[in-house]
Structures are given as C-alpha cells and as structure tokens.
Amino acid sequence: MKLLFIFILSSLILTSPVFAYEVKESTDKYTYKIDIYETPFLNVNKKIKDWLDEKLEEFKQYENYNDIKNDFYTDYELHEYNGIYYLQYFIYSYTGGVHYFLINNQFTYNKSGEILELKDFFKNDNYLETLSKLSYEELVKIGANEDKNWLKEGTKPMLENFSLYYFDKEGLHLTFPPYQVAPWASGPIKIVIPSSKLINLIKPVDN
C-alpha cells in the first residue's frame, strides 16, 4: 500500500504554510509510523514521497522472512540559513538483530523550490577531496575514534560520506551516522568545519 500524501496546490513561492502530519499502520506482522514534513513545493514533496514509499515497500518485504513484529518509524530535522532549507530524514527500521537499522537522506532546496546538491555550494569540482581532508582533521581533533583507519574510511572523498550537512554562520555542519566513523554506541558524530576554512571554497547559491 502506497503512502497517501495530500499535496497543496500552490505556486512555487514560499507563501503557503508548511505542515507536518503522520501516516501509520499496525498489523500482526509490522508497525510503521511516518512523520511527514510537507513543504510548499510539489517537486520537493514528490521527491520525499518517492523515497519514503520505496523504503517502506522494502521494509514490508521482511514480513515474509521472520517471525517477529517488525518496526519502522521516521524522524527529521530542518535547518534553514540564508533562504536555503536542509531537510534531513532518518528512518529507523527493525527486522531482527541487535538494534535498529538507520537509513538517512537529505532534501536541500531554496525558497523558490529549486532542489540543490552539495556540489552547488562549491566553486571547484574537487570539493570532496577538500571535505575529506578537513572533516578527518576535525574528527581527530574531537577524538571521535582512536581507530584512524576507521576515520579515514568514513571520510573518503565520496558523496555518500557527506550526505547530511547544512551551512550557517559558523560554517559547514556535517553529521556522520553510526558506524560511519565510530561504533554504533557512539551515536551520530557531528562536527563543524569553520567558515574561515571554507571562505575560498564556497560560492553564493541562489535562494
């Protein structure tokens, strides 16, 4: 069963109110509860809907493979700075095992409804190499993990290693999910790359 989303017919100007609502279901095999943050933009809402639909359908497949009641729920964070919105989604899925499985995704857009990517904020194409170096240095500085090889692996210059981010006056905030740079018990690891280290690297983005 697909998620039912109600979309507001509005222009692509940030005038319509955004709102959050909940979609949930419970059966003998599974329970899911999805908190949905709806933006004023149909294209952004569709992107969110398609991703949530896909992950929910994947989760439901497990009802045929185990004898436990599976669980699926979501959370999100919204950050805004200079007319840019960073909507970070987190899916917690339990289908057996020691703990929940975490899936995350980010939807970045401006106040005109244009969807943005991390590369849009940087002047040069080698920005991932720069982020790899700077994030590794910050993680070492805060003592995120004594295993330096783990840190290096989790900060390799690959886009998936920098999927949760937002900019503000302090600089670039990065979140590394559990297991990426440290054990599960450490939880998400958050760092800030100061603006002073990015001043010659980032470019203005239309908001």
List each model region and its residues:
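Sec-dependent N-terminal signal peptides
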Residues: 4-15
